Amino acid sequence: MSSEELACKLQRRLRLEVRAETDQGDPQPAPCDAPAGHPEPEPPARAPTASADSELNLKLSRRLDIHQGTARPGRSKVFNPYTEFPEFSRRLLKDLEKMFKTYDAGRDGFIDLMELKLMMEKLGAPQTHLGLKSMIKEVDEDFDGKLSFREFLLIFHKAAAGELQEDSGLLALAKFSEIDVALEGVRGAKNFFEAKAQALSCSSKFEAELKAEQEERKREEEARRLRQAAFRELKAAFSA
């Protein structure tokens, strides 16, 4: 079936659907008995409204895009950075989240153009207006003109994978950010993350990191307990 035939069929079907929805949404007047000898006049044909036509065009375009394979799949609202970016350690993800929240001045969960401008200036890599727009466009998957936390993580994912150009503002962002991935080196991070991913599965890696965090907390608690005991002994010696 050609695209023209498919478009005609979809358009015809969608017009029927929209017309049916419109008919259901509008209350119909109760029928009344026509006087004897006077036939009931035919109701005028309903003209399609502008909103119905707009909805029809949107639905038709969406279905054609799906059929042609050009439609972008809807993204799940639930975002789990640990499963979507398994090459990043828990500590690195926490550092990146802290950095994202630092520059999200509006506290709306996004870094807009102005916030990105201030961010790059503080990192020592100021960008032009067009450069900032190009930076956002490179990872802006939902085309909203700003960076979500997932898109922010995507910057460092691309940097670690060597997918950014040398003159890219995003590469400058990844290099100048004061987090672990910068200390590893953008190029060296690729091998580092690949080695980590090969050495440990996602689940075992998280278990090892959680265990290390628990051990670190135990050591800190033990050190605090020893300091308190030493302080009590010193206090008792002076009190005697």
Curated annotation (Swiss-Prot):
Gene Ontology biological process terms from the UniProt entry: neuron projection development; regulation of cellular hyperosmotic salinity response
Residue span of region Disordered: 17-54
Residues involved in Ca(2+) 1 binding: 104, 108, 115
A GO CC annotation given for this chain: mitochondrion
Presence of keyword Coiled coil: no
Location of this chain's protein in the cell: Mitochondrion inner membrane
SMART domains the record matches: EFh (SM00054)
Keyword terms: Calcium, Membrane, Metal-binding, Mitochondrion, Mitochondrion inner membrane, Repeat
Tissue distribution: Widely expressed. Highest expression in testis, followed by ovary, kidney, cerebrum, cerebellum, heart, liver, and spleen. In the cerebrum and cerebellum, undetectable at embryonic stages, expression increases after birth up to adult stage. In adult CNS, detected in neurons of the cerebellum, cerebrum and hippocampus formation, including dentate gyrus and Cornu Ammonis, but not in the white matter. In the testis, expressed in spermatocytes, but not in spermatogonia nor in interstitial cells. In ovary, found predominantly in mural granulosa cells and those of the cumulus oophorus.
A Pfam cross-reference name: EF-hand_7
Binding residues for Ca(2+) 2: 140, 142, 144, 146, 151
SUPFAM superfamilies linked to this entry: EF-hand
Positions of the EF-hand domain: 91-126, 127-162
GO molecular function term, any single one: calcium ion sensor activity
CDD domains: EFh (cd00051)
Role, per record: Acts as a calcium sensor for mitochondrial flash (mitoflash) activation, an event characterized by stochastic bursts of superoxide production. May play a role in neuronal differentiation.
Protein name listed in UniProt: EF-hand domain-containing protein D1
Species this chain originates from: Mus musculus (Mouse)
